[in-house]
Amino acid sequence: MPIAFISMYKVILSKQAIKDLEKLKRAGKSYAKKAKELIDIVKDNPWINPPSYEKLVGDLQGFYSRRINDQHRFVYAVLPNDCNFVDEQGIPLQGIVHVLKMWTHYE
């Protein structure tokens, strides 16, 4: 029986993250590619290392960050699946990853 890999988390991009992804595309193909790789990683497991992540403090407490490059960070929060989202096969997801932004460092 083949093993199927199932995305365990639903990824939701904020309006800002969608705009940031467009900026990354215009800034260089490799930036957008890295952002999409990070989306795929957190879709499967937002706690996996590598690439390393950092727990944020202050105004961004409750969020985590991963490096896109020296200047840009992928900032996200992991939320419980209170809405009972399921994947394409009807299997309940573990949670929701809310991507806040992807352009510049923390503000």
Task: Enumerate the predicted regions with their spans.
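Alpha-helix C-capping/helix-to-loop hinge sites
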Residues: D20-A27, F63
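Residue-level signal for pocket-adjacent positions within structured domains
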Residues: K19, P51, K55, V97
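PIN-domain endoribonuclease scaffold, especially VapC-family toxins
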Residues: A32-D40
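Short functional linear motifs
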Residues: I18, K29-A32
